[in-house]
Amino acid sequence: MADVDKLNIDSIIQRLLEVRGSKPGKNVQLQENEIRGLCLKSREIFLSQPILLELEAPLKICGDIHGQYYDLLRLFEYGGFPPESNYLFLGDYVDRGKQSLETICLLLAYKIKYPENFFLLRGNHECASINRIYGFYDECKRRYNIKLWKTFTDCFNCLPIAAIVDEKIFCCHGGLSPDLQSMEQIRRIMRPTDVPDQGLLCDLLWSDPDKDVLGWGENDRGVSFTFGAEVVAKFLHKHDLDLICRAHQVVEDGYEFFAKRQLVTLFSAPNYCGEFDNAGAMMSVDETLMCSFQILKPAEKKKPNASRPVTPPRGMITKQAKK
């Protein structure tokens, strides 16, 4: 554990933030042992805290980042760099974008520095069979080595899965599950764990709302389900909640309501992959649980690139990853 003992968090954060004024794309190359230390120390903290977090407002909630490091820095400029504000991120830190390493390293560093004020949930891309395919593995291999990617996997397998803010706002990456009857079921999930192909943990990270579905439907992703407005209303009523806050889908304005404002989707990576013309958003929850949105506008419209592959069915990915 020598990597953890001599970890200089302040120096790491300082170097990661030094590129703030630079042209987007400039890398920060931390030492391999520093990154390993970030993974090991944050993993310890994740395991010392509940898998279902119970948080208090005020805080700011962010959706997918996907390696768009300079947009993450813009989010902090808008919302206030920690510890100025408390944060909850809803997962999908890596893959797709060009700087997954800087992104996840800054987030883990802030988790270590401010463990009671900075929170990270697991997204479906914090899973080896997914980020093996969609960019993070290749970035680790190119800039460091495969062993470091495996160290991240061990860390991701310990991330919390969901959070409840002031007993009223239920937060997770994907959405609801037909298997979820009691919050105790989430609390009983043992870590470390991979993300299974089906069941409660899979659904919390993979499911999507769908206005055209009554009850539960098939998901075009080939994994998990879709759920309709009535499912949302029943869930909130049963658990005495006001709102579901989730990420997992690109939405044009960075945030989008569903089911009469009983669910909100947040997406925090503007111009996603350089191919979408979407804004990014961050939701601020004040002490009275009033929610407002800060928007990161997209850059000037670019020609969409039709060549980006969609996420294929889960089974297919798993098979590819085993090669």
From Swiss-Prot:
Domain of life assignment: Eukaryota
Positions of Mn(2+) 1 binding: D64, H66, D92
Record's subcellular location: Cytoplasm; Nucleus; Nucleus, Nucleolus; Cleavage furrow
GO cellular component: cleavage furrow; cytoplasm; kinetochore; membrane; midbody; mitochondrion; nuclear speck; nucleolus
Binding site for Mn(2+) 2: D92, N124, H173, H248
EC number(s) from the headed UniProt entry: 3.1.3.16
Name of this protein: Serine/threonine-protein phosphatase PP1-gamma catalytic subunit A
GO biological processes: cell division; glycogen metabolic process; mitotic nuclear membrane reassembly; protein dephosphorylation
